[in-house]
Amino acid sequence: MIGKLSGKIDSQCDDYVIIDVNGVGYLVYASGTTLAKLVEGRFYKLFIETHVREEHIHLYGFLTLEEKNFFNLLQSVNGIGTKMALSILSNLTPTDIKIAINNDDKNIFKAISGVGDKLTERIMLELKGKIAKIFSSSAIIKDSSNISSVEINEVIKALVNLGFTRFEAQNTVQGIITQNTKISIDELIKTALKNRNSSF
């Protein structure tokens, strides 16, 4: 599975780019927002979401982890696939989506082609709790740290994958950052694992 590509933008089309990585060209689909920021001939790092199907392998690229997270989050809504998720992200930033859902602003989604009343209702209903759960804890921790909320959420997810419960990961991260607000992401993970092992 490909998680990241660093290379030069070789060419660009309406919904994808070809990124040259050491002489190999990868076709990467992206949102209109991301495509608008990419310039042919320049080097970029793209975070990649790989979709493997029987008939194809598709790569989806993002300049930020937050956009990648929202790409996956949107697809958790019944009726939203990769194309619709990219369409939404071509019109709205992750911040726009968070604010709209928190404020119950349905009109912002209805303005997007292909998003009708029923899909808008599902987006509001199915994502409201998920967004609150994912971002509330990291936003609270962010207030006392130089690490972004998205990075904190990635650390929490990494710790969960390493055996922590989500509650345990959140509390551990918050405790470490409170003691050292300038800690790096790598050190944050190492310290969390060290503290957990020493408690057994």
From Swiss-Prot:
MF terms in GO: ATP binding; four-way junction DNA binding; four-way junction helicase activity
Identification of the protein by name: Holliday junction branch migration complex subunit RuvA
Disulfide bonds: none
Compartments, record wording: Cytoplasm
Complexes and interactors: Homotetramer. Forms an RuvA(8)-RuvB(12)-Holliday junction (HJ) complex. HJ DNA is sandwiched between 2 RuvA tetramers; dsDNA enters through RuvA and exits via RuvB. An RuvB hexamer assembles on each DNA strand where it exits the tetramer. Each RuvB hexamer is contacted by two RuvA subunits (via domain III) on 2 adjacent RuvB subunits; this complex drives branch migration. In the full resolvosome a probable DNA-RuvA(4)-RuvB(12)-RuvC(2) complex forms which resolves the HJ.
Domain notes: Has three domains with a flexible linker between the domains II and III and assumes an 'L' shape. Domain III is highly mobile and contacts RuvB.
Spans annotated as Domain II: 64-142
Superkingdom as given in the UniProt entry: Bacteria
Entry similarity comment: Belongs to the RuvA family.
Chain residue ranges for the region called Domain III: 147-200
GO terms under biological process: DNA recombination; DNA repair
Transcription among keywords: no
Keywords of the record: Cytoplasm, DNA damage, DNA recombination, DNA repair, DNA-binding
Family annotation (InterPro entries): DNA_helicase_Holl-junc_RuvA_I, NA-bd_OB-fold, RuvA, RuvA_2-like, RuvA_C, RuvA_C_sf
A GO cellular-component term linked to this record: Holliday junction resolvase complex
Residues covered by region (Flexible linker): 142-146
Residue span of region Domain I: 1-63
Functional summary from the UniProt entry: The RuvA-RuvB-RuvC complex processes Holliday junction (HJ) DNA during genetic recombination and DNA repair, while the RuvA-RuvB complex plays an important role in the rescue of blocked DNA replication forks via replication fork reversal (RFR). RuvA specifically binds to HJ cruciform DNA, conferring on it an open structure. The RuvB hexamer acts as an ATP-dependent pump, pulling dsDNA into and through the RuvAB complex. HJ branch migration allows RuvC to scan DNA until it finds its consensus sequence, where it cleaves and resolves the cruciform DNA.
Gene3D superfamilies (UniProt xref): 5' to 3' exonuclease, C-terminal subdomain (1.10.150.20), DNA helicase RuvA subunit, C-terminal domain (1.10.8.10), Nucleic acid-binding proteins (2.40.50.140)
